[in-house]
Design a protein with these regions (language model features):
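Long, contiguous, secondary-structure-rich segments that constitute the structural scaffold
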Residues: 2-31, 36-37, 42-131
Length: 131
């Protein structure tokens, strides 16, 4: 069947479930959250060293030993994992008023790379209460 000219092809593709993709967020309080899949792809680490490139505006999370004091513990949270990265975020001047989702998190040579310029606001809307 030939399509008429008024049809437009949808090029967005299907939605990939959060179970099958990497999902990473940064909250306004400095909590880095990632799902089970991301934790598994990192090698299921118990702690991580955190790095920041001001030039590229990228956060790097490298699996590390929990025995080294400056490494951040990775703790379970609901169906994922969290890093309490407040000191890291404050030290590097990373500010956000919202929870941000990293659109294209990537793992290179075992290091998770999170581009601060490649984020979307995922903070739930606050609705005004009716009087």
């Amino acid at each position: 069947m030939a399509l008429e000219r008024d049809f437009e092809k949808f090029t967005g593709g299907p939605v990939v479930s959060t179970r099958d993709r990497m999902h990473v967020t940064l909250s306004h309080t400095g909590i880095i959250y990632f799902n089970q899949n991301t934790h598994r792809l990192l090698g299921n680490p118990a702690a991580a060293a955190l790095y920041y490139s001001r030039e590229r505006d990228v956060i790097a999370i490298e699996p590390a030993s929990p025995r080294i004091e400056q490494n951040f513990p990775i703790k379970p949270l609901q169906s994922g994992w969290r890093i309490l990265a407040g000191p890291f975020v404050g030290h590097n001047g990373i500010r956000t008023d919202h929870t941000l989702r990293f659109v294209h998190p990537d793992i290179e040579n075992g290091v998770l790379l999170l581009g601060m310029r490649d984020t979307v606001n995922v903070t739930p809307r606050r609705y005004k209460k009716k009087k």
